[in-house]
A protein has these predicted regions:
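Short S/T/G/P-rich N-terminal loop/turn motif that feeds into the first structured element of a domain
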Residues: 1-189, 193-218
Length: 218
């Protein structure tokens, strides 16, 4: 399976129009059997953008379904006559192609808040980072009330990157879970053992997300 992470940056003042645009798109994605994990906005940090994740079996399926979606008269009417009648609403689009790691669960959204985390591994350390997550981290996240939604690597290029998503009932629950996780002796031991030859992670990026009203449930 391929997972496509897409972020749309709205033109100034156009975020409401972008939501309208994507709410219509969500219905047409379903019509054309384009799987969607969810639609999100930033809970903390950058505003004015919406992110969603497509799911498809392979790139051939993507090409066929996206072509059918783009040719749908209902979509053309929505773009030409409705959301963009007063100008372009999207300033920039970013997308990343991802594939699940062997230890990832099948992604499901069951909680109110999601956290998108990107770890750039130290050179040559990505296999060790995968081992730590598969052997220790996922289990300890669950122990401390964090939902393991999905774990991915990038499809193209020579990326040294691990991407994953966690879920929480609320922002307060997120704070509590991370606090107890960081002080867990099992985690401290696992981290120390995995880093005895040096740190595994060079940089970490985090986004706190909340599903939109039109995001699929469950």
């Amino acid at each position: 399976m391929i997972y496509e992470w897409r972020t749309y940056e709205a033109m100034p003042g156009k975020l409401p129009a972008l939501h309208t645009h994507l709410e219509v798109a969500a219905g047409l994605f379903k019509k054309h059997e384009l799987g969607v994990l969810g639609f999100w906005t930033e809970e903390i940090g950058i505003g004015g953008q919406v992110t969603y994740m497509w799911i498809y079996a392979d790139f051939e399926e993507r090409q066929k379904k996206v072509a059918a979606f783009g040719a749908d008269p209902a979509w053309k009417q929505q773009v030409a006559e409705e959301t963009e009648k007063e100008g372009v609403i999207v300033a920039r689009t970013h997308n990343t192609m991802l594939q699940l790691t062997p230890y990832s669960p099948v992604p499901r959204l069951k909680m109110n808040v999601q956290e998108w985390r990107i770890y750039d591994a130290m050179p040559g350390k990505l296999p060790d980072l995968h081992t730590r997550f598969a052997t220790h981290t996922l289990r300890l996240f669950e122990k401390h009330g964090m939902a393991n939604i999905g774990y991915w690597t990038e499809v193209f290029g020579t990326s040294n990157r691990l991407v994953y998503m966690l879920g929480y009932p609320s922002l307060g629950d997120r704070e509590k879970s991370w606090a107890t996780f960081q002080t867990d002796r099992d985690w401290q031991q696992a981290r120390a053992e995995s880093e005895k030859n040096g740190p595994l992670v060079a940089k970490t990026y985090t986004r706190i997300l909340r599903p939109t009203a039109y995001s699929p449930k469950g």
